[in-house]
Amino acid sequence: RPDRPSLIDASSGRSLSVEESARLTRGLAWYFHSLGIGAEDRIVVCVPNSIWHFIIHAAASWIHAVTVPLSPLLPDKQRQEIYELVSPALIISADGHPVDGVSALPLSLIEERALQAVNQSPATWEPLTCYEQTAALVFTSGTSGKIRAAQLSHANLWWASQCFRDG
């Protein structure tokens, strides 16, 4: 059911259908691929919560890249430390803040890039199969107060989504 609602942005009220979400995901995956981003490359997502977190993650998963979600409220020094730890291939942020030697993309251009790229992707281009590969690095300080990355596989995220969905 391609017209069924897929994602709803709570802050803006924007709703995407299954078809729209799939089209944006495919286009963004091809855009990342065209930048030379591939398996195990890191894509930092440092933007306020929105539907784009999901679309960016799904697009990165398509090519086996790893998303690294970061709060835009983190102090600059802490963000810089994380950038040094993960060596991102791309940083997506609200303002497109550049980091030495790393491509930056402002969130405001994501949809435009995805829609341009979707028409360039081959019709036969399909997501790569993945399961145990790293899907995301989630930074936490835990009880120690020292920032650490929790490495989550696609299987971890699938299990978590099923638990959330099924209660």
Can you say where each PLM-predicted feature lies in the sequence?
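Conserved pre-ATP/AMP-binding loop-to-beta segment of ANL
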Residues: 2, 120-139, 146, 151, ...
